[in-house]
Regions:
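Conserved phosphate/anionic-ligand binding catalytic regions in large, soluble enzymes, centered on
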Residues: 246, 472-476, 550-567, 624, ...
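Conserved catalytic cores of very large enzyme subunits
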Residues: 112-116, 120-552, 573, 579-582, ...
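Short, hydrophobic beta-strand segments
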Residues: 22, 68-74, 360-361, 565, ...
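Charged, amphipathic alpha-helical regulatory modules used
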Residues: 2-133, 770, 774
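Metallocofactor- and cofactor-centric catalytic cores in central/energy metabolism, strongly enriched
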Residues: 52, 334-340, 344, 569, ...
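Long insertion/accessory domains within large nucleic-acid-processing enzymes
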Residues: 739-800
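Conformational switch/transducer regions in large eukaryotic molecular machines and scaffolds
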Residues: 35, 729, 754-755
Length: 801
């Protein structure tokens, strides 16, 4: 229902002396102060839906109706008036003033909302939406292919779970979600089940000490190939036991010990093929031959230079022993490469019980010994090569590379060469995203990779050991608050904004408390891999899982969306511009996140569970909240004039700051939203200019950015050979050269939010598609090229302002 923004609304009650307080009982049982602006807004909405002009006389009539309703409540009610009674009084007032068509529209709107509320908890309605392939349902998650049986089964189960969920939730929470005031995430899994969200599973304890998966007890692996295979099996089971992403934290350092076992075996083989009596020249020839075929064995492209000859670990040993060590290194490098390739293919070919590829992230980059370095190299080489004969960009795992001074940040650091490989990989495959070691420690209290795409644990010291613990911890769920709606409902009055804000935070807190309570109802036998065999802990069958959550070991997240839009209500839509912004506007936007952070700290101290502020990725929520607010408030400049809301604290995607300007604006927010954050920059094709990307990475590191993603054109058309940015269409994307949009004849890779996705194969919701279509580059450069039949080149170019 359309409503126009109210400006300068004043009621007689605002300036009247304090009299009897008029109270209202909401549908969810909450009691709040009567606010005449709500009636004025609703009646003006009915006028707008009828295209009726509101002049001075109509303004007076509407205001009189609101005052009459307040007076009648005072006369007729000793306690709070119910919402339904107030609506009846409004309808009666409209009829008495002969506004019959307005009364009918007002009544119909009320009836439609009652029907929507009933439908939300109707299982039959949920199933009907799925059968009718409601876009908001089948395109909610870009990682789910709704055409396949396993996903259809999951969507059916999710639809039933979601309908049941709103009957299980506290009334205030359920009502706020259905109205669009808040969003209770993942209601297709929780609270119907007691599942938790994302995590840093302790795969490393499981690999080291053994575990049971299904009917198979597993011992500790004796090679990196078995370690990689086992970890993908664990990932599959973890993905079936939680609904969020999972991350292999510091994978290069942990995998290194299994690569060392391969090296030891190859060294034994080297003693067999190079016995003590073997002439040195023959041994040297064997090593040269092994090195000569290495580029082919590692699938090097023709233009990639071969790796230099390896050096032995022990340079003081005799020459024959040195050659054995070099030969063992060459063989181990191949074993590492194959293991990382196995992991890449197994993760991408898995489809778990929830009908999707597991949301997996691999964090790496800090290992400096030979084995960890080779693991990093293998991860990059496999990702650069791509999947299959057409070398498709792998969507999973998400790669998160750590940059640290003294390790890889600067020329002269031992792993600086691997930073160069990371840059090459990012320009060709968009991943890795990068995290900056010292900045992550400053923001979150300790170092770790994100859980899934952007959720971060805070630093936590185990009171039993006094040591920092990251692996084996998790997030219990997210509730996101619709910040633009609060601003719209405030009608530009900041005092009113903060009043409504506090009310919404109270409901969001109640929702998060419910999430904690529900997760605590899980038992170890519900998810043995998580609770019994080491991913989260090694509990007994009847132990309480709460010991893994309390004392702030786990996190639960308060999310937000649309700071740009909310601030536009108070400072106008031009408060952010291509190259600068209104400092007062930024301070207001920052004050919202600061206030959320203060509340989370208070709740954590009072309850012993870690509440964190989370910059919600909003893959489909960007569509839902915006759509609901457009229905309620109409098209409001700077707020609902796009079909999406801006993610969290980000610079609006249609503006064109330089990468440095964008990061300068955004850098302060993660320090108050340490439970989840990421920054992005939009680049042209940078494969020929990786140093430009390195300059941005280095700048981000210098100014305190913690986590940075690279968005660059990497789409490919297999019909005409185009490489670059596919053009957005109404439903998807097409090749700008030949118009091809056949998912079997192109590879389109876009960042939906934190993860990458192929929107041609798996279309996304309308709002997210619109958001991607509105993105502009923050740097001038080529955005695509194709070689024509006559051998000439055609290029596409985007000019930054």
């Amino acid at each position: 229902m359309e409503t126009q923004t109210l400006e300068g609304v004043a009621t007689e009650t605002e300036n009247a002396p304090e009299m009897v307080k008029v109270l209202v009982e909401k549908r969810d049982g909450r009691v709040v102060d009567f606010d005449p602006i709500n009636i004025i807004s609703a009646v003006k909405s009915a006028f707008a839906d009828l295209d009726k002009k509101i002049g001075p006389q109509e303004e007076r009539l509407i205001r009189d109706i609101a005052n009459q309703v307040e007076a009648e409540i005072k006369d007729r009610y000793n306690g709070p008036a119910k919402i339904e009674d107030i609506q009846n009084l409004v309808e009666h007032g409209l009829i008495e003033d002969h506004l019959y068509d307005v009364a009918r529209t007002y009544t119909n709107y009320r009836l439609n909302k009652d029907i929507e509320r009933a439908k939300a908890t109707d299982i039959n309605e949920a199933v009907r939406r799925l059968v009718d392939r409601d876009e908001a349902l089948v395109r909610e998650n870009a990682n789910k292919d709704s055409n396949v049986y396993s996903t259809q089964r999951d969507l059916l189960a999710g639809a039933v779970s979601k309908a049941s969920a709103f009957s299980m939730l506290p009334d205030a929470v359920s009502n706020a979600h259905m109205k669009g005031d808040i969003h209770f995430h993942d209601a297709d899994y929780s609270p119907f089940t007691a599942q938790s969200n994302c995590s840093l599973p302790n795969y490393w304890d499981m690999l080291a000490n053994g575990f049971t998966l299904g009917n198979a007890p597993m011992g500790s692996p004796n090679s990196i190939s078995i370690a990689a295979t086992q970890i993908t099996q664990i990932m599959k089971d973890v993905a079936s036991s939680q609904y969020g992403g999972q991350t292999a934290n510091r994978a290069d350092e942990h995998f290194a010990e299994y690569a060392k076992k391969d090296y030891d075996k190859f060294l034994e083989q080297a003693h067999e093929i190079m016995p003590d009596d073997l002439p040195i020249e023959i041994a040297e020839r064997q090593v040269r031959m092994a090195k000569a075929v290495e580029p082919k064995r590692l699938h090097f492209e023709k233009d990639r230079p071969a790796l230099p000859m390896d050096e032995p670990f022990d340079k003081t040993s005799d020459r024959l022993q040195q050659l054995r060590e070099i030969w063992a290194k060459i063989q181990t490098r191949k074993a590492i490469y194959d293991a990382m390739q196995t992991m890449e293919y197994q993760i991408n070919s898995n489809r778990v019980s929830n009908g999707q590829t597991p949301f997996v992230t691999v964090g790496f980059g800090l290992g400096t010994d030979w084995f960890a370095r080779e693991i990093q190299r293998a991860i990059f080489l496999n990702r650069i090569r791509g999947l299959g004969s057409e070398h498709h960009t792998a969507i999973f795992p998400k790669l998160v590379f750590t940059i640290k001074h003294g390790v890889n940040a600067d020329p002269g650091d031992p792993n600086y060469d691997l930073k160069q490989l990371a840059l090459e990989c990012a320009t060709k495959r968009m991943y890795p995203d990068v995290i900056f070691y010292e900045n992550i420690v400053k923001i979150t209290g300790s170092f770790k990779a994100p859980m899934g795409c952007r959720s971060f644990l805070q630093g936590w010291i185990d009171p039993k050991t006094g040591k920092d613990v990251e692996d084996g911890r998790m997030n219990l769920g997210v509730v996101t608050v619709n910040i633009p709606r609060i601003a719209l409902e405030s009608h530009g009055d900041k005092d009113r904004f903060w009043k409504i804000f506090d009310e919404r935070m109270t409901v969001a807190h109640q929702a998060l408390q419910f999430r904690i309570m529900r997760c605590k109802q899980a038992t170890p036998v519900n998810a043995p891999t998580l609770f019994r065999f080491g991913a989260f802990g090694r509990l007994g069958a009847n132990d309480s899982v709460d010991q893994l959550f309390r004392n702030e070991r786990a996190t639960v997240s308060l999310g937000y969306i649309g700071l740009y839009e909310a601030t536009s209500v108070f400072y106008g839509k031009d408060w952010m511009r291509d190259h600068d912004w209104d400092p007062e506007g930024k301070e207001f936007a920052l004050s919202i996140v600061k206030r959320m952070n203060e509340l989370c700290k208070d709740w954590s101290t009072a309850e012993g569970y870690h509440y964190s502020v989370y910059s919600t990725p909003a893959e489909s929520l960007t569509d839902r909240f915006n759509r609901m607010d457009r229905e309620k408030f109409g098209e409001v400049d700077g707020v609902t004039d796009h079909d999406f809301y801006t993610n969290s604290f980000h610079y609006p995607v249609w503006l064109q700051p330089t990468p440095m300007e964008k990061l300068d604006y955004e850098k302060d927010f993660p320090y108050y939203a340490s439970g989840g954050f990421i920054n992005y920059c939009e680049f042209p094709c940078l494969q020929a200019n990786p140093k430009a990307l390195e300059a941005v990475w280095d700048y981000a590191y210098t100014i305190g950015i913690g986590y940075l993603g690279t968005n660059t054109p990497i789409d490919r058309c297999y019909e005409c050979g185009f490489e670059g940015d596919f053009e957005p269409t109404e439903e998807g994307f097409k090749c700008p050269e030949c118009g091809n949009s056949d998912p079997d004849r192109c590879n389109v890779t876009k960042r939906t939010c934190g993860y990458l996705a192929n929107p041609v194969q798996r279309p996304m919701v309308h709002g997210r598609h619109e958001e991607i279509a509105h993105r502009v580059k923050h740097m001038s450069g080529e955005t695509g090229h194709v070689t024509l039949d006559d051998g000439s080149e055609r290029e596409w170019f985007e000019e930054a302002k």
